[in-house]
């Protein structure tokens, strides 16, 4: 185990000098080998570049405050290793797999490197089974595949985390399997809320949690998604169906941008790292299902300035099976979840996978909403009276559909006061089919707002008259 010393420290970037014949390899973990009152004990550094003459450039996984030149560093000779297996369930860990929940050491019989190869093409096993979420708009227009990858896209404050929490609530509780949650560069409060949500629902013993919050240095935030993924991969390789939640994948990209700039690489479009596509691909290619087990991944993706063409969300799009796009315009109407049914897509929305009825109802809903969108300018200028009878009917139905796409969430009960609703897929299809076919043209549109099934809308209409 070779020993070196710190020769330069610029923020999170630390240069370490070793004897020339004992230079660490790229991605080797180095540990600060001396006690100092000013610096975190056992600070881990990950080698990013070999500069030559025995000097390597590393990124600190913790705060580098108090580091000084000449401090001793030892090479562990291996990459960052984290505990995996059943000992991680019900525990909260940091990027290095250390417990941060004050519940004692993690009893794991195996450790794995966070840098693993993606499964080969022969090992992959695509799935066409649907994963019911109980959220009407998602199940109807952008259904999830079991073992697929889903992205929740949205700008600031349109409800990505609330939607993610509801999906965890509906799927993790219904699905008796195991889940891994990676909190990448998000608020500490949200991690705390998630922990208590899981504890109150008695599913904590089926969830492993890894957090690298927004107050952590960029090296930490860049690697925490890999730590969570390594834990999920171990469960998959045991032959299990795993849920892997990431909040937020954009912060992973942002941490990569910070690290890239610190390492002196030339930035590319909009200041992102030149290796953006490669870094994203390396992470996403590992989140996949094999013939042994599956990983179903749900990832929140922050969209900077609501611009879906920004390089970060645009690069993420390529890897996903379903994209759930949250719209500020829909949120402004008070319709939650604020999912845009015209912008959201799914590869599963195919008559051969979801069935002819589901497919035709979803397309009828989208075409009705599209017609309303086209007529909105005419209505704004000339008013409803100038429309033809067919268009008036289309607008009335579209407004009912729009309101029926809203739904009270279990996780939002605290601040809405309305009990949450889980709507089975068959009830969702039945309700929207009836609205599109004009069976509820006589009901007021307010009856369809914030209800679960269509029967609830009918009951609500009775109270409005």
Curated annotation (Swiss-Prot):
It is an enzyme of class 7 (translocase). This is ATP synthase subunit beta. It catalyses: ATP + H2O + 4 H(+)(in) = ADP + phosphate + 5 H(+)(out). The lineage of its organism: Bacteria, Pseudomonadati, Pseudomonadota, Betaproteobacteria, Nitrosomonadales. F-type ATPases have 2 components, CF(1) - the catalytic core - and CF(0) - the membrane proton channel. CF(1) has five subunits: alpha(3), beta(3), gamma(1), delta(1), epsilon(1). CF(0) has three main subunits: a(1), b(2) and c(9-12). The alpha and beta chains form an alternating ring which encloses part of the gamma chain. CF(1) is attached to CF(0) by a central stalk formed by the gamma and epsilon chains, while a peripheral stalk is formed by the delta and b chains. Produces ATP from ADP in the presence of a proton gradient across the membrane. The catalytic sites are hosted primarily by the beta subunits. It comes from Methylobacillus flagellatus (strain ATCC 51484 / DSM 6875 / VKM B-1610 / KT). It comes from the Bacteria. It is a peripheral membrane protein.
